[in-house]
């Protein structure tokens, strides 16, 4: 005979790993073309000048420059990359 009554099993106790979303390059930081600026679910931030959007809504720089976040129409947030003047050689 069993000396202990069988315990019930819990249906909780598991979780998924975080998805590492968020801003990767902040306003004022320099970027080169192809750098990821924001990883997001849906369009929390929209692409502005010199910024592209991937199929998973990731925003990335399409040119070298400096990141700038700004507000646009309809209360949307935008991120642009301002190209810097080329250094005189």
UniProtKB/Swiss-Prot annotation:
Q: What is this protein called?
A: Large ribosomal subunit protein bL27
Q: Where is this region: Disordered?
A: 1-22
User: Which HAMAP family does the annotation name?
Assistant: Ribosomal_bL27
Its GO biological process annotations read: translation
Q: Which SUPFAM superfamilies match?
A: Ribosomal L27 protein-like
Q: Which UniProt keywords apply?
A: Ribonucleoprotein, Ribosomal protein
Family assignment from sequence similarity: Belongs to the bacterial ribosomal protein bL27 family.
**GO MF entry, a single one:** structural constituent of ribosome
The protein's gene is named rpmA
Q: Where on the tree of life does the source sit, at the highest rank?
A: Bacteria
Q: Name a GO CC annotation attached to this entry.
A: cytosolic large ribosomal subunit
Disulphide connectivity of cysteines: none
Name the Pfam families for this protein. Ribosomal_L27
InterPro entries from the xrefs? Ribosomal_bL27, Ribosomal_bL27_CS
């Amino acid at each position: 005979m069993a000396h202990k009554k069988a315990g019930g099993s819990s249906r909780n106790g598991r979780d998924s790993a975080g998805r590492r979303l968020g801003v990767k390059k902040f306003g004022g930081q320099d970027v080169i073309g192809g750098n990821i600026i924001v990883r997001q679910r849906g369009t929390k931030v929209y692409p502005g000048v010199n910024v592209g959007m991937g199929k998973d809504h990731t925003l990335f720089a399409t040119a070298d420059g400096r990141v700038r976040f700004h507000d646009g129409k309809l209360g949307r947030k935008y991120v642009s990359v301002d190209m810097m003047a080329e250094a005189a050689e």
